[in-house]
From Swiss-Prot:
SUPFAM superfamilies attached to this UniProt entry: Pseudouridine synthase
Source organism: Pseudomonas entomophila (strain L48)
GO CC, alphabetical: cytosol
Name of the protein described by the UniProt record: tRNA pseudouridine synthase D
Positions in coiled-coil regions: none
An example Gene Ontology molecular-function term: tRNA pseudouridine(13) synthase activity
Superkingdom per UniProt: Bacteria
Record gene name: truD
Amino acid sequence: MTELELLGPRASGDALGTAVLKAVAEDFQVDEVLDIPLSGQGEHLWLWVEKRDLNTEEAARRLARAAGVPARSISYAGLKDRQALTRQWFSLHLPGKADPDLSRAEDETLRVLKQVRHQRKLQRGAHSANGFTLRLTGLQADHPALDARLEQLKQQGVPNYFGAQRFGHAGGNVHDALDWATRQALPEQRNVRSRLLSAARSYLFNQVLAARVADGSWQHAQVGDLLAFTDSRSFFAAGEAECSDPRLAILDLHPTGPLWGEGPAPGGGTPQALETEVGARHPQLCQWLARAGMDHERRILRLPIGRLTWHYPEPDILQLEFVLPAGCFATVVVRELVDLVPAGQTDSPCVF
């Protein structure tokens, strides 16, 4: 499957050129934003960890092993990219135990930067946002055109697609999900089951969003839409009055799309008709998600880009800094700017 099939059309026009992303880990930096005051006491040890070219699950296993606790005793808020330099929180459950020596977990790929005690463990999804510093190298694009496009993105946001990495190489996760859905069976391995269910839901959401990008309605509320605020999981139906809510214009309130699960798609009008049509094209996936016990949830169609700044450390390098809500993909921002080409090493440092 191609990227266009997995995501959908761009909203801002054709790519303005080409660039390389992730030539080195420092080109893709992620800092988890967690708005939780830590007390300094309790049976949970929270760890602020820097990872380089290491996925979150492997980092968790190494930290648990070094602490001498089972893997179920370590928690994290969210998964971060492997091919990146990332900083995120973990928590270890250590009732009645002293702080362990975690140096055995550390090497050039993992460093523990801070340790703080707290009364509660870190819950999945507890982070409010992620801060990104991206360096696009080998840039071949007109700077004034990029500047104008970035100003446009700052004002209108981007389609909140699930990024291509959610679907595996060439959409392999979607193909695997379709295979299981055809048999209406679930993988026994929990991590495989979670990955494929997530890929299926993400693919269906992207199909709905792609249709609304194509007809221009992705950033406009329609009667029957279910609206949600940027940082809220609750939603409400849009009537005529809600469609002109001024908070839509300032990127605070957004139309949403479906994260498929049990029960009919809520909402009404044209939006519901579209979602029903997408579901009818993929009945086995929808039935599979419902039978797996997934609840029907919503995700905003429009992604506001917080604190967006950019500069050019060199003529062929564009550095971007911005903040996105948890669960959103930095690569869909880049996609509205340039086409990415395969990585090749660069020697230029990342300037902050």
